[in-house]
């Protein structure tokens, strides 16, 4: 729940997101590892068998129909598995888009091409003057039920307290 997130968050990672993307949001305290490039930030827990990740990315202005493909391209460019040839992708056929409170919510499955990894993701997409801002969370927990994990991650990327700095 958001109440739990308010008391168990990571101020340094939140400041990193605010500086790079202008977004004020709460990041779970366990998310400590990060990778950054110009329009992309990946924050994750360190557990190999219970990985929870948050990606913040900026997309160029594009129609809603192209968002999933654009997100997929950025993920494959920035997130790689243990094998050098493996990269993360969205299973595009699984992606569903709905709109709530002026923000688009994407859900579906992700997979690691070239590796036996995959799982659910949830993302919020907010149109901005420069294009679109994406907050995407995904889980890799092969031995665990993911329903509660994804509820927690959905709270991170989609709640009324996120400020997009507009």
List where the protein language model places each region:
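Surface-exposed amphipathic alpha-helical segments
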Residues: 1-4, 25, 31, 133-166
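Charge-rich, low-complexity N-terminal segments
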Residues: 1-9, 46-48
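N-terminal "mature-domain start" segment
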Residues: 6-35, 158-160
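Solvent-exposed loop and beta-edge segments used for protein-protein assembly and interaction
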Residues: 17-19, 48, 100, 129
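Envelope-exposed proteins and targeting segments
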Residues: 21-23, 52, 121
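Secretory pathway targeting signatures of secreted, lumenal, and periplasmic proteins
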Residues: 28-84
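Charge-rich, low-complexity terminal tails
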Residues: 40, 44-62, 127-155
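Signature of long, low-cysteine stretches enriched in small and polar/charged residues
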Residues: 79-131, 144-146, 158, 163
């Amino acid at each position: 729940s958001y109440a739990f997130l308010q008391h168990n968050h990571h101020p340094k990672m939140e400041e990193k997101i605010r500086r790079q993307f202008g977004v004020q949001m709460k990041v779970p305290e366990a998310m400590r590892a990060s990778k950054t490039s110009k329009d992309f930030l990946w924050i994750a827990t360190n557990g190999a068998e219970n990985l929870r990740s948050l990606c913040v990315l900026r997309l160029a202005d594009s129609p809603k129909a192209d968002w999933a493909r654009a997100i997929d391209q950025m993920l494959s460019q920035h997130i790689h598995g243990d094998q050098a040839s493996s990269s993360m992708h969205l299973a595009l056929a699984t992606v569903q888009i709905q709109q709530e409170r002026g923000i688009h919510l994407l859900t579906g499955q992700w997979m690691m091409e070239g590796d036996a990894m995959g799982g659910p993701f949830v993302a919020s997409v907010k149109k901005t003057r420069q294009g679109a801002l994406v907050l995407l969370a995904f889980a890799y927990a092969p031995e665990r039920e993911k329903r509660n994990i994804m509820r927690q991650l959905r709270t991170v990327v989609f709640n009324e307290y996120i400020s997009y700095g507009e």
